[in-house]
From Swiss-Prot:
Gene Ontology molecular-function annotations: identical protein binding; molecular condensate scaffold activity; nuclear receptor activity; nuclear steroid receptor activity; RNA polymerase II transcription regulatory region sequence-specific DNA binding; sequence-specific DNA binding; sequence-specific double-stranded DNA binding; zinc ion binding
Pfam families for this protein: Hormone_recep (PF00104), Nuc_recep-AF1 (PF11825), zf-C4 (PF00105)
Annotated organism of origin: Mus musculus (Mouse)
Basic and acidic residues: bias regions: 211-222
GO CC term, one of those recorded: cytoplasm
Subunit composition and interactions: Homodimer. Heterodimer with a RAR molecule. Binds DNA preferentially as a RAR/RXR heterodimer. Interacts with RARA.
Domain notes: Composed of three domains: a modulating N-terminal domain, a DNA-binding domain and a C-terminal ligand-binding domain.
Cellular localisation: Nucleus; Cytoplasm
SUPFAM superfamilies registered for this protein in UniProt: Glucocorticoid receptor-like (DNA-binding domain), Nuclear receptor ligand-binding domain
Residue ranges, annotated region (Hinge): 205-230
Protein name: Retinoic acid receptor RXR-gamma
A GO biological process held by the record: retinoic acid receptor signaling pathway
NR C4-type ZnF: 139-159, 175-199
Length: 463
């Protein structure tokens, strides 16, 4: 297309070669321009000398003069694949900057020709740093700082709340002046009529408030339905029945055979706990869905929580006792006896963190049963075959207890939280009791696993 290019043109002396040096090279046309008479369609090609061939990375091309991002791209790419090393005697070093003024001077972005595959300057998406792009929205009603778009208009929290209250309560305002009051950040509360009218003029939508209220109502109804479903699946009535079924008979407290009792409070407590283990299994069988679990999981749950379950029971039973605890056998263990037996510190914790708190809030039997059921359904017990099922049952008890407290004690909105706060104390005291061998005679020489397994396999005895 360019005729016969059998020779390459001469390089001028200023490029490091010897004067008049002539060399025939194998450099590609992208690096060196050939000589010879061009075709008529390319009149710009002449036999006059032109500047020496240069690689892209060797000269101050418009790309390199622009800096980031092109400099990063070209430096990462390296020299073009078509650029070859100069032959011996030719030094392809960039000429002084004075010789590149024509190359480096760029009058506009249109003069810049990017590399193939790279976008032009006009097409580059640079982050906007103009002052206008950093301006935050202001409230369209009063000019205060906007907290976002509310009911279709950028507005502050004050105007948002004012508009919502007006719509929800269907309020009607009047203006004392000419219905043209100035509404700005300082005077927005002076005239409610003009403020409301400006909300409407600026585009706030009444229907947006009504739709928001409808969504809130639907969400509340949905949550209520879910909670109701949980309550039906874990009725508090059955939990209360389980507590009442295993409650020691009050009249039996006075019939305790004194000859069988000892002066050692630890022995008395262990004896009472041994008796209570049988009723503990009966109680667990009456808790909804406990018997639906595998026999192995039932054993694991009782083994993990028996100490906390028994401590919760005698603590609640002792709320009417002065400075002591009442055992299921009818015996009273006083603080002085516990201190003399060397278990005073843990005994004091039971009285302070459990008995006293239960007494102050007047915890009833239903709440006690729910707390014990939460302890029973422990998904963290080691060895469970289906922890997720146990966790689901615990969550159902949570929902049942919360609904019960809201319905039974509406004047105490924090009661549910107060009840749950007793669980960490119960857990800590239970672990401390084991650490001190508080119930060291509980099972004697019988391993607890086989002991509980034998009781669980016994049919439920209705009393």
């Amino acid at each position: 297309m360019y005729g016969n290019y059998s020779h390459f043109m001469k390089f001028p002396t200023g490029f490091g070669g010897s004067p008049g040096h002539t060399g025939s090279t194998s450099m590609s046309p992208s690096v060196a321009l050939p000589t010879g008479k061009p075709m008529d369609s390319h009149p710009s090609y002449t036999d006059t000398p032109v500047s020496a061939p240069r690689t892209l990375s060797a000269v101050g091309t418009p790309l390199n003069a622009l800096g980031s991002p092109y400099r990063v791209i070209t430096s990462a790419m390296g020299p073009p694949s078509g650029a070859l090393a100069a032959p011996p005697g030719i030094n392809l070093v960039a000429p002084p900057s004075s010789q590149l003024n024509v190359v480096n001077s760029v009058s506009s972005s249109e003069d810049i020709k990017p590399l193939p595959g790279l976008p032009g300057i006009g097409n580059m998406n640079y982050p906007s740093t103009s002052p206008g792009s950093l301006v935050k929205h202001i409230c369209a009603i009063c000019g205060d700082r906007s907290s976002g778009k509310h009911y279709g208009v950028y507005s502050c929290e004050g105007c948002k709340g004012f508009f919502k209250r007006t719509i929800r309560k269907d309020l009607i305002y009047t203006c004392r002046d000419n219905k043209d009051c100035l509404i700005d950040k300082r005077q927005r509360n002076r005239c409610q009529y003009c403020r409301y009218q400006k909300c409407l003029v600026m585009g706030m939508k009444r229907e947006a408030v009504q739709e928001e209220r409808q969504r809130s109502r639907e969400r509340a109804e949905s949550e209520a339905e879910c909670a109701s479903s949980s309550h039906e699946d874990m009725p508090v009535e059955r939990i209360l029945e389980a507590e009442l079924a295993v409650e020691p008979k009050t009249e039996s407290y006075g019939d305790m055979n004194v000859e069988n009792s000892t002066n050692d409070p630890v022995t008395n407590i262990c004896h009472a706990a041994d008796k209570q283990l049988f009723t503990l299994v009966e109680w667990a069988k009456r808790i909804p869905h406990f018997s639906d679990l595998t026999l192995e999981d039932q054993v694991i749950l009782l083994r993990a929580g028996w100490n906390e379950l028994l401590i919760a029971s005698f603590s609640h039973r002792s709320v009417s006792v002065q400075d002591g605890i009442l055992l299921a056998t009818g015996l009273h263990v006083h603080r002085s006896s516990a201190h003399s037996a060397g278990v005073g510190s843990i005994f004091d914790r039971v009285l302070t963190e459990l008995v006293s708190k239960m007494k102050d809030m007047q915890m009833d039997k239903s709440e006690l049963g729910c707390l014990r059921a939460i302890v029973l359904f422990n998904p963290d017990a080691k060895g469970l075959s289906n922890p997720s099922e146990v966790e689901t049952l615990r969550e159902k008890v949570y929902a049942t207890l919360e609904a019960y407290t809201k319905q039974k004690y509406p004047e105490q909105p924090g009661r549910f939280a107060k009840l749950l706060l007793r669980l960490p104390a119960l857990r800590s005291i239970g672990l401390k009791c084991l650490e001190h061998l508080f119930f060291f005679k509980l099972i004697g020489d019988t391993p607890i696993d086989s002991f509980l397994m034998e009781m669980l396999e016994t049919p439920l005895q209705i009393t």
